[in-house]
Amino acid sequence: MSDRYYRPTFVNVNLDAISSNFKHIEKLHPNKTVIAVIKANGYGLGSVNIAKHLMTSGTDFFAVATLDEAIELRMHGIKAKILVLGVVDPKHIRQASRHRLALTAPDAKWVEDASRYIEAEDKPVWLHIKVDSGMGRIGVQTKQAYDMVVDKVAAVEQFIFEGVFTHFSSADEDNALTERAYDKFLGIINDNKPQYIHCQNSAATLRYDCSECNAVRLGISLYGYYPSEFIRAVSNVKLQPAVQLVSTACFIKHIKSGDTVSYGATYTAQSDEVVATFPIGYADGLPRAMQGYNINLEGTEVPIIGRVCMDQMMARVPDDTLLGAQCIIIDNNADSNQSLERVAQQLGTITYEVLTSLSRRLPKRYYIGDDIEVYNELMK
């Protein structure tokens, strides 16, 4: 049974919000295929369950980062199209064939190497050629190099040239880099356009039309978050945050003035205080740097005191706090002091890092209307 959990700490995932965000993007780009990006375990929320939910509403194209992530989806019955965005070792090409996956072709050499491992009886492998328009990670940088990849793909019977794509480095900022990258991308692919042409990540999807493309890749915004405050300001799309991180007080104690809390004795009580311990720590994705950060304890903001431990954290709480009191660490209310954006800002990082750090040992509670389905990966 995967619906059991024995530690009162969990992630609430609003599947209705995820569906709403997806539909908003479909309306914004009505003539484009929306590719749902569910890499990094669905941005920490459970890729398999996110995929299953989206498929019920018609989504038929997903993207992940690694071959392992793609195979995991297949093993759990996800039959939709899956594109692996990262570079797969060519010697594993037959795994992609066996599981009917689409792979990224980063250059001509990769195609050559992969062709040596494919067998005549193997099923087709769909390939999306990656163009480096300025990100500097993977992909071809010139039209000549792109055309060479196209020719190499055409020479292998089992390879299907299905798509071409790029990734903008600065679409979440107000600058001209993205326009230049888009022009470079179009110039490179000019004479060889496959079925799918995609260049828009979440930021570009919310900001640009990119009319020469016919697909968009929806990542962080699928889950209700803007890639940057700039994009939030310029976008007309109202995203709905889907994530809430919750824990419950498992121990209450009274301490005296001068008592210390947690490793290194970094917190010293200035008066007699009440301290609640919560069963969540940095092994769950709660950074140690959150010492001093306020959580919401049943409507009252209280500070995390002392260093966050691997499995537990402590907070200074009101005198009348009882065992079982519930705290919100990350809120699904965009205006809350515990919103994902404000948590990330306090930590000096981005929403992506906080979200994808959520551990697989955190049970997920998936909401559709009033219905709740619990999934605990440790009990599957």
UniProtKB/Swiss-Prot annotation:
Pfam families: Ala_racemase_C, Ala_racemase_N
Keywords, ordered alphabetically: Isomerase, Pyridoxal phosphate
Any single Gene Ontology cellular-component annotation: cytosol
One GO biological process term: peptidoglycan biosynthetic process
CDD domains registered for this protein in UniProt: PLPDE_III_AR
Record's keyword annotation contains Transferase: no
Binding site for substrate: R137, M310
In-chain residues carrying the UniProt-annotated modification N6-(pyridoxal phosphate)lysine: K39
Pathway field: Amino-acid biosynthesis; D-alanine biosynthesis; D-alanine from L-alanine: step 1/1
Cross-referenced InterPro entries: Ala_racemase, Ala_racemase/Decarboxylase_C, Ala_racemase_C, Ala_racemase_N, Ala_racemase_pyridoxalP-BS, PLP-binding_barrel
Domain of life: Bacteria
Record: active site: K39, Y263
Molecular function via GO: alanine racemase activity; pyridoxal phosphate binding
Cofactor: pyridoxal 5'-phosphate
Entry EC no(s): 5.1.1.1
Catalysed reactions, as listed in the record: L-alanine = D-alanine
Keyword tRNA-binding part of the UniProt annotation: no
HAMAP family: Ala_racemase
Family: Belongs to the alanine racemase family.
Function: Catalyzes the interconversion of L-alanine and D-alanine. May also act on other amino acids.
Record's protein name: Alanine racemase
Organism: Macrococcus caseolyticus (strain JCSC5402) (Macrococcoides caseolyticum)
